[in-house]
Design a protein with these regions (language model features):
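Activation-segment/catalytic-loop signature of the eukaryotic protein kinase fold
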Residues: 277-335, 340
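Active-site phosphate-binding/coordination module
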Residues: 64-119
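Glycine-rich phosphate-binding/hydrolytic loop that grips phosphoryl groups
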Residues: 217-221, 270-271, 321, 332-367
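Phosphate/pyrophosphate-binding loops at sites that engage ATP/ADP/AMP, CoA/4′-phosphopantetheine
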Residues: 51-69, 125-129, 168-176, 200, ...
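Glycine-rich beta-strand-to-loop/alpha-helix junction loops that act as flexible
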Residues: 73-78, 185-186, 234-236, 305-315
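Gly/Ser/Thr-rich active-site cleft segment
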Residues: 10-12, 107-213, 277
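N-terminal glycine/serine-rich phosphate-binding loop of ATP-dependent small-molecule kinases
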Residues: 1-85, 131, 198, 206-210, ...
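Glycine-rich phosphate-binding loop of actin/hexokinase-like ATP-binding domains
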Residues: 80-100, 136-140, 145-167, 206-280
């Protein structure tokens, strides 16, 4: 039988599941919508949706040809989930008034971190912080349900300021014993427990692998891991992500480390772009690319003539055609529009030691096709 990994990505409104082989064949894919996206216990739906997806997978018959060698989990963040499943989603408001409760040093750390302000808000607003022993990020909660192993996925060591250190947790009066230890992307977190295996209808002792935050999984799944590559991650919101060997700084740009040690990711975000008119959306896309191109030129970094589109809007070929014309960029799409799943596959096969590292896995697994020949 051919080797494959079961890729799971937790979104805000749905769970996406794909079965992908080591050479990038997307054997099976499905989406399971959540019943109540606004519930504070939405995380309890994740395993149910995964069970339903696995049932569809078995019903499809592909498992007679492809063996599942691992499960990989990625998901939205910075979502927080208590041990009993109480969920504080990434898009819920932070109570910034709590900053005044801390010393100046702690306030500075809160401003740097994506997670600390949310943990502090969670602690202040919800009794579940005190009642439960562990506080997880989103995908790590599902990993815990599958393995009973508590971890926090750190995409790369330079992300530490966006997460936390024990010193920063102490400064912000957060009990570090509630926060699971870090693990890298593409590592085996644990094995599927007998009860989880029975629930899902999968073999017990199946490795469960860290896929990481969804935006990082998407960058891996579009192979935006080389200097001078560009990805348009477009859904309800939109982000243009440029991989650079130079740290690019601008008031309109958010720069974070790449999952690859010698690169940075510079991004321009368009919040709620799906709510804009098509004309507004395209003009904002052009503006974002112009910002990144200008910044790259100022720093003598080569800027590409093409970009890879992923996400919901990437399934709209008519929109992509217009975007290509307006932005002057050639556009490529991957064999799976939901590149997070491809990124999960890269993490999974790296953990299984089929590839030396994530970058090598992406080179083999990610396939791209230009839309321009067909549409322009």
């Amino acid at each position: 039988m051919k080797e494959s990994v079961l890729c799971v990505d937790i979104g805000t409104t749905s769970l996406k599941v794909g079965l992908i082989s080591a050479d990038g064949e997307v054997v099976f894919i499905c989406t399971k919508k959540f019943k109540d996206c606004y519930s504070h216990f939405i995380s309890l739906e994740w395993k149910i949706c995964l069970q339903n997806a696995v049932k569809d997978l078995h019903d499809s018959g592909v498992c007679t040809e492809f063996e599942i060698n691992a499960i990989v989990v990625s998901g939205n963040g910075p979502t927080l989930v208590s041990q009993e499943g109480f969920t504080f989603l990434w898009n819920e408001k932070i109570d910034f008034s709590v900053f005044s409760d801390f010393c100046e040093q702690a306030q500075n750390e809160l401003k740097k971190s994506l997670f600390l302000p949310r943990i502090v808000t969670f602690k202040k607003l919800y009794p579940q912080y005190l009642e439960d022993k562990i506080i997880f990020s989103g995908p790590e909660f599902l990993i815990y349900e599958l393995t009973q192993k508590a971890v926090t996925i750190l995409p790369e060591e330079r992300f530490i300021s966006a997460y936390w250190t024990n010193e920063n947790l102490s400064l912000c009066k957060i009990d570090f014993q509630k926060i699971p230890p870090f693990i890298e992307i593409g590592k085996i977190c644990g094995k599927l427990t007998k009860s989880a295996a029975s629930y899902l209808g999968l073999p017990s002792d199946l490795p469960v692998v860290s896929g990481g935050p969804d935006f990082v999984a998407a960058l891996i799944g579009t192979d935006t891991l080389q200097n001078g590559t560009l990805c348009d991650r477009c859904g309800s919101s939109e982000g243009f992500n440029f991989a650079s060997s130079v740290f690019l700084q601008d008031k309109n740009v958010r720069s974070l480390p790449s999952v690859v040690k010698d690169l940075w990711n510079a991004s321009v975000l368009i919040p709620e772009s799906a709510n804009l008119s098509k004309k507004e959306r395209l003009l904002e896309a052009k503006k974002a690319i112009d910002i990144l191109r200008s910044l790259a030129e100022q720093n003598k970094v080569s800027f590409p003539a093409k970009m890879t589109a992923t996400g919901g809007q990437a399934k709209d070929l008519s929109l992509l055609k217009e975007k290509s014309v307006v932005t002057g960029m050639q556009i490529e799409i991957c064999q799976c529009a939901d590149a997070e799943l491809l990124g999960d596959a890269c993490a999974g096969f790296t953990a299984l030691q089929k590839f030396e590292n994530i970058r090598a896995a992406a080179k083999k697994i990610v396939k791209k096709n230009s839309i321009n020949k067909e549409l322009l």
